[in-house]
Amino acid sequence: MIIKEFLATEKAVKLIESQNTLTIIVNRNTTKKDIKNEVEKLFSVKVEKINTLITPKGEKKAYVKLKQEYKASDVAHKLGML
C-alpha cells in the first residue's frame, strides 16, 4: 500500500483549512505520480501538485494540494480527521 497514514497534527489541519492541502505519510520509495494516482482514485478528487520530503525519522511526507473545485476538508471529514 502506498499511503501509510494521514496526519492530523495542528499544522496539517491548518494546511487543510487554509491551503486545501492534505499531509500524508507514504512509503519511502513511492513517486509523486503514484501518490497522485492513489489519492485521485481513493477520494475521487483531482490533485494540483505534490511536494515531498524525507523527515529526520526517515519517513516520506507528501503535501498533496487539491484543485480548487475540490475541498481537502471534505476528504478530511471522510477520514474522520475534522
Swiss-Prot record:
Keywords per UniProt: Ribonucleoprotein, Ribosomal protein, RNA-binding, rRNA-binding
Recorded coiled-coil stretches: none
Gene Ontology terms for molecular function: rRNA binding; structural constituent of ribosome
Leader sequence residues: none
SUPFAM superfamilies hit by this protein: Ribosomal proteins S24e, L23 and L15e
Any GO BP: translation
Pfam entry (one): Ribosomal_L23
GO cellular component: ribonucleoprotein complex; ribosome
Claim: RNA-binding is one of the keywords in the record: yes
UniProt-listed PROSITE patterns: RIBOSOMAL_L23
Alphabetized InterPro entries for the sequence: Nucleotide-bd_a/b_plait_sf, Ribosomal_uL23, Ribosomal_uL23-like, Ribosomal_uL23/eL15/eS24_sf, Ribosomal_uL23_CS
Family designation: Belongs to the universal ribosomal protein uL23 family.
Subunit text: Part of the 50S ribosomal subunit. Contacts protein L29.
Function: Binds to 23S rRNA. One of the proteins that surrounds the polypeptide exit tunnel on the outside of the ribosome.
Name of the molecule in the record: Large ribosomal subunit protein uL23
Organism phylogeny: Archaea, Thermoproteota, Thermoprotei, Sulfolobales, Sulfolobaceae
Gene designation: rpl23
